[in-house]
Amino acid sequence: MPFQKIVDEFALGSVNHSPAFFDIVKMQSFNAEYIRAMTVDEFIAACEVWLTGERAPWKQANYDAKVFAEIAPLVQTRVQLLQDVPSMVDFLFCEMPAIDEASYVKAFAADWAASTLIAIREGFKNCDWKADSLKAVVEKIGEQNSLKLGKLQAPLRVAVTGRSVGPPLFEPIELLGRDATIKRIDAVLAKKVS
């Protein structure tokens, strides 16, 4: 909200007499609303300081502004603070994502996790490299194994991003590319074997 609008709408009579406190959760909620109200171009510009320079958790040579511009609309709806953006997209700009151990253990606890991830890997080798086609491969494997898409996404997400939460999965996989995706799946499967 613009400062002048705040000044115009302030009324001393509306001030509550009870002790004031700073509500961080409410502030973050307001901030998230402000972020979602930005245009995508404004959001990209606001994120630049967090994505370039010393604050970024990747080598600057690995950062691609065009790739971020592609994923920005998906990230914009999921962050409350701009400082959270790098952790949502780091897997796109790091050679290999750090695997969150708790996410890994949870995603691979089921006996079907590794075998279905192998099947997904094989399906990804020859499919059209578009988000819809990638999703269709995973859905087909889910049908063959009587598993819903959400369950199958967990091991795949951990393999690709290193954690269990993030932006929608298939658009970032498309951006990451076939070779990098398969390399990450292989790495997490090797971890599973060891």
Task: Identify the role of each PLM range.
Residues M1-P57:
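A conserved active-site cap/scaffold subdomain adjacent to cofactor or substrate pockets
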Residues F3, V40, I44, F68-A72, ...:
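Short runs of predominantly hydrophobic/aromatic residues within well-ordered alpha helices
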Residues I6-V15, E54, I99-A102, E143-N145, ...:
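Short, mixed-charge aromatic SLiMs
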Residues H17-D23, A61-E70, E143-K151, S164:
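Structural motif
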Residues S29-E33, L74-Q80, V158-A159:
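Short, hydrophobic/amphipathic alpha-helical patches that form generic packing surfaces
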Residues V40-N145:
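Small-residue-rich helix-loop
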Residues D128, D132-K192:
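Charged substrate- and nucleic-acid-binding regions of tRNA-handling and nucleotidyl-transfer enzymes
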